[in-house]
Amino acid sequence: FAPKITVGKAGSGLHIHMMLEKDDKNYIADDVGLTNIAKKLIAGVLGHAQSLTAFGNTIPTSYLRLVPHQEAPTMVCWGDSNRSVLVRVPLGWIAKTNMIKDANPQERGSVPYIPGKQTVELRSPDGSADLYHLMAGIILAAKDGILAEDALEKANKIKNAGIKCSQSIFLNCLLSEIVVLT
């Protein structure tokens, strides 16, 4: 479970998928796409990226994984099909896009769509994570975003508009004051 063992190849992450559910209904996406409450959750998670990274990446080799072109997050923003973002929303799994079939091209039969399974993915943690603090932090960050009045505006502002960091300064960029959503 080492985060990175080979230079030039993707490391091993511990991506955390989150779902908002109440009364057996998933509130991450609806028939149109991502919901406003999901965007607020994302804003909360990104607003607390510093703390979540500290809990999710606890050893020096954790940061060797977080470099460009290694299928790891290198931008503090969110998006749907971009693996370089800190928070990814795999919206392609909703019924109208047929991402399931694209991801499984060898599948001969029809791939059933299972509604209500949409998630939001935090991509930075790895096997070194302090899981108890990380999960508590994610819950509190999500709650903070959902309750914040300006979270929707912040989420819309930072979709695919992250701060791009070189591999040598990703940690500094992530932990700097620039990243804090203001």
Where would I find each of the regions flagged by the language model?
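Active-site capping/gating regions of soluble enzymes
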Residues: 1-150, 156
